[in-house]
Design a protein with these regions (language model features):
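Terminal leader/tail segments of proteins
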Residues: 1-161
Length: 161
């Protein structure tokens, strides 16, 4: 693994902390599914963790919850706690477990309680006007933009980092 050095206006995921940091942002965050706006906010939080592109958590009040139904299963993050999954449904189009939230996160992450994160591999996600690229693999939900460099955890062979 060779770290990519950030250029002007970029940040490296290898400079992000562990345990992760929560950071409020005023950038415009949008999520679409089936050509429908699901969420839009300028009050989202980024969670920054070593080796991962940022994961964005959108306030529930900035999300059109009428398009969300309870998803299947749950997972546990060593830092944030138990994640609840959400399925996005617009008309007859469905994205299973396309989003998640931490309804009752650990103390360090209370800022993101009841906020929603979405997988850019299952929804169209934007930071400002840039369409996000999904973090490799299908477990982590990081958002890759041109201002973040890796390499990123998630691809085959990176799980042991």
């Amino acid at each position: 693994m060779k770290r990519i050095e950030p250029g002007p206006g970029q940040e490296s995921v290898w400079d992000y902390p562990r345990p992760p940091r929560v950071e409020l942002s005023s950038r415009r965050i949008r999520v679409f599914f089936a050509d429908t706006l699901i969420a839009e906010s300028t009050k989202a939080y980024r969670v920054l963790e070593t080796s991962h592109p940022p994961t964005w958590y959108i306030p529930r009040e900035d999300t059109k919850t009428e398009f969300l139904i309870s998803g299947k299963g749950s997972s546990h993050c060593e830092w944030k706690g138990v994640a609840t999954y959400w399925t996005v449904k617009v008309g007859d189009q469905v994205a299973e477990n396309a989003g998640w939230s931490y309804e009752h996160p650990s103390t360090r992450f209370t800022a993101i309680a009841r906020h929603l994160a979405f997988y850019p591999s299952r929804c169209e996600c934007y930071v400002d006007e840039e369409r996000v690229q999904p973090q490799p693999g299908d477990f982590y939900g990081g958002w890759i933009t041109s201002d973040v460099v890796g390499p990123f955890k998630g691809s085959p062979g990176t799980w042991g980092w």
